[in-house]
Amino acid sequence: MELVFIRHGFSEWNAKNLFTGWRDVNLTERGVEEAKAAGQKLLAAGYEFDIAFTSVLTRAIKTCNIVLEESNQLWIPQVKHWRLNERHYGELQGLDKKATAEKYGDEQVHIWRRSYDTLPPLLAPSDPNSAHNDRRYAHLPKEVVPNGENLKVTLERVLPFWEDQIAPALLSGKRVLVTAHGNSLRALAKHIIGISDAEIMDFEIPTGQPLVLKLDSKLNFIEKFYL
């Protein structure tokens, strides 16, 4: 069986080189075109889906919608869930990556961005931009809404959704599309493929490129490739 991942198209804060995380920003025109191209690639390659999973952030939802529209599958069920959100970058969210590197040093920022288990500076729950003040997450217990995450914590957040929804869908024979974010998809890929803590630092997923994971009937990883 095959599982398709798509990282959302290029966003407004990708263009501005800002840390984004759980902040909700839109796609750029380039991002829209990337999503259209991804949908057209899937259509040309004959990929059909029974269900699509995405996050509750605009850039991923719009990418999912565009991909499905371009591949003539906008009618299939979509599940939007906070567990597929991007990694929460804590106090770094909204900051310029270059300016942050100048302030703290390239090595420290690289560790914050790419280390598997180093947390960024945490955002105060009382901060106006905290997810605690966003009605998208008002139904959640306060203790599960993050104030900052590393990739390890992101995987711990994403894994229950894999086990409860994505894996059962695949095992039931459904063809699955997951349109999410660089780090939530990296976390899932780490689990599925078996990437080591060290190797995951250099594992990247480009925006708007369909990544196909080939799995056996028990969801063991066989191979991966981009369309």
Curated annotation (Swiss-Prot):
One of its GO terms (biological process) is gluconeogenesis. It catalyses: (2R)-2-phosphoglycerate = (2R)-3-phosphoglycerate. Its EC number is 5.4.2.11. It holds the Pfam family His_Phos_1. One of its GO terms (molecular function) is phosphoglycerate mutase activity. Gene3D superfamilies: Phosphoglycerate mutase-like. It is an enzyme of class 5 (isomerase). The keyword tRNA-binding does not apply. Substrate binds at residues 7-14, 20-21, 59, 86-89, 97, 113-114, 182-183. Keywords: Gluconeogenesis, Glycolysis, Isomerase. The record marks 181 as: Transition state stabilizer. The keyword Cell division does not apply. The active site is at 8 (tele-phosphohistidine intermediate), 86 (proton donor/acceptor). Pathway: Carbohydrate degradation; glycolysis; pyruvate from D-glyceraldehyde 3-phosphate: step 3/5. NCBIfam families: pgm_1 (TIGR01258), PRK14115.1 (NF010713), PRK14118.1 (NF010716). Homodimer. Catalyzes the interconversion of 2-phosphoglycerate and 3-phosphoglycerate. This is 2,3-bisphosphoglycerate-dependent phosphoglycerate mutase. It comes from Haemophilus ducreyi (strain 35000HP / ATCC 700724). The gene is gpmA.
